[in-house]
């Protein structure tokens, strides 16, 4: 890890409904940044952020964890939070340390109750919100359907990035 000035560091909380793929997305970010050379899998119990024995056993995040990622001269502290309501305190804790929120949705499930809840948390905190539609490799996933659901639930300000 290099040394970074404060204006080159971002704290981004990753939030979303349970099983939307937040931890797997964090693993993909780590491998693409070169921080790791093999992507861990939740099912195999070898991800960077879900290291607690109970998380490995349950195959889900129970506590908030921070994953530092260096990318294009910036340092991103990705704050991986649990997706189930039982651990809402952990989500709020992660959001408290964040400059922005990345809400992860499953392209198959679309907008879920947990998605709506974390959106409310981020709006209350007043941080910029980004959405990431995940799990697009599922044959029943639909980016367009998920985008339309997001516009319906969160307003017309939802605009896709076409890059």
Predicted regions and their residues:
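Canonical P-loop GTPase G-domain recognition
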Residues: 128, 137-163
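Amphipathic helical hotspot of TIR/SEFIR-family domains
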Residues: 110-126
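Active-site glycine-centered loops adjacent to acidic/histidine catalytic or metal-binding residues
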Residues: 134
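Histidine-centered acyl-transfer/condensation active-site motif
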Residues: 131
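Loop/turn elements at helix/coil->beta-strand transitions in domains of secreted/extracellular proteins
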Residues: 100, 126-127
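Low-complexity, flexible helical/coil segments
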Residues: 49-52, 114-117, 138-140
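P-loop NTPase switch module centered on the Walker A-proximal segment
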Residues: 1-105, 109-111, 145, 154, ...
């Amino acid at each position: 890890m290099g040394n970074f000035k404060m204006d080159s560091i971002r704290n981004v909380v990753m939030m979303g409904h349970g099983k939307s793929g937040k931890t797997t997305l964090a693993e993909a970010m780590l491998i693409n940044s070169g921080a790791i050379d093999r992507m861990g899998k939740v099912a195999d119990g070898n991800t960077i952020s879900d290291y607690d024995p109970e998380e490995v056993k349950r195959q889900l995040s129970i506590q908030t964890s921070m994953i530092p990622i260096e990318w294009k001269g910036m340092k991103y502290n990705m704050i991986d939070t649990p997706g189930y309501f039982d651990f809402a305190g952990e989500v709020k804790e992660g959001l408290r340390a964040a400059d922005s929120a990345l809400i992860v949705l499953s392209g198959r499930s679309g907008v879920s109750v947990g998605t709506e809840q974390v959106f409310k948390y981020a709006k209350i905190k007043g941080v910029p919100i980004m959405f990431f539609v995940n799990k697009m490799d599922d044959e029943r996933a639909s980016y367009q359907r998920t985008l339309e659901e997001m516009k319906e639930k969160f307003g017309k300000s939802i605009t896709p990035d076409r890059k």
